[in-house]
Amino acid sequence: MSSLTFFIFCLQLFIFTSTVSGISIKRCTEEENNTWEIEVGLCIQTENFRAIKTGCYKIQGPGGLLTEGNGFKIFAHDDCSKEKTQNNFILDSVNEAVYALGKYVYMEISTSNITTLNSLPQCAKRISLSISCDQVTTEMKSYVESVSFKDYDLEFVITTDISCVKHVSSSVIVRNECEKKYISTGKKIFGFNNKIDCSAVKFSEHVNYLKTCSVGKFDRKKYYEHQHNYIKKIFHHNEL
């Protein structure tokens, strides 16, 4: 083989290798890198009562949202006041599934298509979720856990009323569209036993059972005094 022939062979091999490598490289657009989603999953095991598959209701306020149904309420809000931010609460979607004849309820509270994650005020990145029992009229007997995403400066705090809840497992996922397509980063799992399966349903299978919560109407008479602080945060009320 002459030197020229060998050179041409090497050049063709280089071009072929580069082409194949180029095909295998997974690239993301700027939009995918800057579009975020947040998903909070709660597997709630009930205590001394069974949830009923009557559906749930979501009520949205500027500072948060609340859900009703199945023997408990969930209050979700950030730390912002009306004066501190013009941004609405970043979580805006609620889905629910009831398992094992009402012994387990899986709640998914989420949002997608966030393009302002890095520019959000600090108060909007401090998210609290509280599970409160309908039948308990006094202060919550609570268990508190938290998780932080330092890269995004996000913090989540979950408070559970153990008067009606036997057990809660929780997951928090923060990722952009690029991560969602190619890698499973961004997920943090926390809970009593670091398990996010619910009853006999695996985490990856919840999507097959989830139903969207209907839009409800706020009625302050449904809420006990110890729940009023959550309401004030969600609706930016100074008093009730």
UniProtKB/Swiss-Prot annotation:
Any Pfam family the entry gives: Pox_T4_C
Top-level taxon of the source organism: Viruses
Record family assignment: Belongs to the poxviruses B9 family.
Protein name per the record: T4 protein
